[in-house]
From Swiss-Prot:
Protein name: Chaplin-C
Function: One of 8 partially redundant surface-active proteins required for efficient formation of aerial mycelium; the short chaplins assemble into a hydrophobic, amyloidal fibrillar surface layer that envelopes and protects aerial hyphae and spores, presumably anchored to the long chaplins. Chaplins have an overlapping function with the surface-active SapB peptide; chaplins are essential on minimal medium while on rich medium both chaplins and SapB are required for efficient aerial hyphae formation.
Compositional bias annotation for Gly residues: 84-112
Location relative to the cell: Secreted; Secreted, Cell wall
Keyword Endoplasmic reticulum: no
Region (Disordered): 84-129, 154-227
Induction: Transcribed during aerial hyphae formation on minimal medium, about 10- to 25-fold lower expression than the short chaplins. Strongly induced during aerial hyphae formation and early sporulation on rich medium, under control of ECF sigma factor BldN.
Length: 259
């Protein structure tokens, strides 16, 4: 019993380390290209393409049966490239020639392309494309049966946007305005006559003209610390951690006593 428990804990710890250390990025895609030409007959010369691209990222996760201080942080998952796109065309010739062509695709994900030409017949010469792109991200999760202080922070998942549906740069930019003509400079004002020393009485000068130190009001703001770590308050985390540690100890002693 003791050896089985020890092997199970070691296996779980190894699996958790592998999952937590995996920061994957899916760059692969799926594509299809087909052509049908010169296929006379009924319902002939048709092309159906359905490439499926399902990238799955699993990173920054912890799985513990009995675990303490097993964090997973700073992992990133990303699916680069665009989404699915493609064309759907179908022109069936009733007793004539059916021609259909289409090119679909994007810079990533799943894409399909092809054409159908010179296929006489009823319901022939059709071309159907159904590219599917379904990215799945699972990151930054913590699963504990009996565990304490196993945070998952700083884990990111991202899927790159499609290239076909993006707006070309510069379409919404406002052109720079024309420079205004500078106005004619006005006549300079005649400088005032400097006042004599007898014009001002000592003590009548304002505070703005008096040399010396001046008090400047500082902007008031509430002091705040950067928000880091978990949202769980410390007063609740410590009792929960102690209880989890005690529960793990009790389970271990029961397993040891039953041997």
């Amino acid at each position: 019993m003791r050896q089985a428990t020890r092997k199970g804990l070691m296996t779980m710890a190894a699996a958790t380390g592998v999952i937590a250390a995996a920061g994957g990025a899916a760059h692969a895609d799926s594509g299809a290209h087909g052509t049908s030409s010169g296929s006379p007959g009924v319902l002939s010369g048709n092309t159906v393409q359905a490439p499926v691209h399902v990238p799955v990222n699993v990173c920054g996760n912890t799985v513990d049966v009995v675990g303490v201080l097993n964090p997973a942080m700073g992992n990133a998952c990303a699916n680069q490239g665009g989404g699915a796109s493609g064309g759907h065309g179908g022109h069936g010739g009733h007793g004539g020639y059916g021609d259909s062509g289409g090119e679909g695709g994007s810079h990533g994900g799943s894409h399909a392309g092809g054409h159908a030409t010179d296929s006489p017949g009823v319901g022939s010469g059709n071309h159907v494309e159904v590219p599917i792109d379904v990215p799945v991200n699972v990151c930054g999760n913590s699963i504990d049966v009996v565990g304490a202080l196993n945070p998952t922070t700083g884990n990111d998942c991202g899927n790159g946007g499609g290239g076909d549906h993006s707006t070309p740069p510069g379409d919404h930019e406002t052109p720079p305005g024309e420079p205004h003509n500078p106005g004619n400079p006005g006549n300079p004002d005649t400088p005032d006559k400097p006042s004599g020393p007898d014009d001002e009485t000592p003590g009548d000068s304002t505070d703005g003209n008096r040399p010396g130190a001046q008090t400047v009001d500082q902007p008031r703001g509430d002091a705040a610390l950067a928000e880091t770590g978990s949202d769980l308050p410390l007063g609740l985390a410590l009792p929960v951690g102690a209880g989890a540690l005690l529960a793990g100890t009790v389970l271990y002693r029961k397993a040891r006593a039953s041997v």
